[in-house]
Amino acid sequence: MMTDKLNLNVLDAAFYSLEQTVVQISDRNWFDMQPSIVQDTLIAGAIQKFEFVYELSLKMMKRQLQQDAINTDDIGAYGFKDILREALRFGLIGDMSKWVAYRDMRNITSHTYDQEKAMAVYAQIDDFLIESSFLLEQLRQRNQYD
């Protein structure tokens, strides 16, 4: 079992940036006044930030599991769903199926660009913010500096 604390600064900053982007886009009066190219760029930026926060979340989830594990070699060999199962068991996440769905969302946007698919992914970012906020709070609690 390791005792080093995780540095959550990058995840904190990325999460905050995504959250603020979604808040700005949610201001319908402001958003509707923007030219369509700006609207598209803002949505694309939010999706890219989602992808980044998602990837960072998984990395931090895995690192925390390595911190908590008795045998860290086991965690290193785990596949994606194994990581999620352990994260659920350790209380880092609340709903494994949502994290599987987020991976599917990330795969959709990273392999092709289709406006309809992009909007479907964007529509799920609010839910992702709730789930990733839960993860971030669990990570903060486990990595408090005295």
Curated annotation (Swiss-Prot):
Q: What class of enzyme is it?
A: hydrolase
UniProt xrefs under Pfam families: NTase_sub_bind (PF08780)
Q: Is-annotated flag, keyword Transferase?
A: no
- How does it get modified post-translation? Modified by cognate antitoxin MntA; probably at least 2 successive AMPylation events occur on Tyr-113.
Annotated positions of the O-di-AMP-tyrosine modification: Y113
Task: Supply one GO molecular-function term.
Answer: endonuclease activity
Disulphide bonds annotated for this chain are none
Q: What is its EC number?
A: 3.1.-.-
What is the residue range of the motif RX(4)HXY motif? 106-113
* The protein's assembly and partners: Homodimer. Forms a complex with MntA, probably with a stoichiometry of 2:2.
UniProt similarity note: Belongs to the HepT RNase toxin family.
The protein's job, in short, is: Probable toxic component of a type VII toxin-antitoxin (TA) system, probably an RNase. Neutralized by cognate antitoxin MntA. Neutralization is probably due to AMPylation by MntA. A mixture of HepT and MntA binds nucleotides; the highest affinity is for TTP, ATP binds more tightly than ADP or AMP.
* Identification of the protein by name: Probable ribonuclease HepT
Q: Which organism is it from?
A: Haemophilus influenzae (strain ATCC 51907 / DSM 11121 / KW20 / Rd)
The major lineage groups are:
Bacteria, Pseudomonadati, Pseudomonadota, Gammaproteobacteria, Pasteurellales
